[in-house]
Amino acid sequence: KLLIQNKISLNTRIPAQEMINKHADLILSWQWENNLNYLYFDAAWMGAPVVHNANLCPDLGYYYEGFQMYEAADVVEEAIKSHPTDETYLERNREVIKRYTHHNKNLIKQYNELLENLVNNKFVEMNYNWQDNSVSPK
């Protein structure tokens, strides 16, 4: 009924690789409280220029702070100019993304400890430092 009344629409999900390879020259992301979004991780992993404001991974792609749209516009210009000749972009981004994958043994250890504490009804609040890849109790 909602579809017939045009109150909702259903769209086919396009796989990230297809969308980026066929339809995008640059990914511009503005997010709020979704700092580790798989869309820009996928795009950066594939080498696409990603302009974003995710403060948990400012060393990924091309970063602008907070909601600074003028800064974002400057970063878009920088990405357009520098990306075609940046031969280290793909490798750099893959190293950044590995922090959040099974390649990060410290992160896996911390997740296991957190899950064990959860199972045993122990609450421990943690801080994650992306710069040195460390996790510590608050």
Label each region the model flagged.
Residues 83-137:
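A charged, aromatic-enriched C-terminal amphipathic alpha-helix characteristic of glycosyltransferases
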Residues 22-102:
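Catalytic binding pocket for nucleotide-activated donors in carbohydrate/polymer assembly enzymes
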Residues 1-14, 18-19:
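Nucleotide-activated donor-binding/catalytic signature segment of Leloir-type glycosyltransferases, i.e.
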Residues 11-14, 57, 136-137:
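Repeat-unit-sized solenoid/scaffold elements
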Residues 16-17, 40-41, 112:
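Short amphipathic alpha-helical segments and helix-helix/interface helices
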Residues 18, 70, 105-109:
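Generic alpha-helical secondary structure signal
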Residues 15, 25, 53, 108-109:
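Alpha-helix initiation/capping motif
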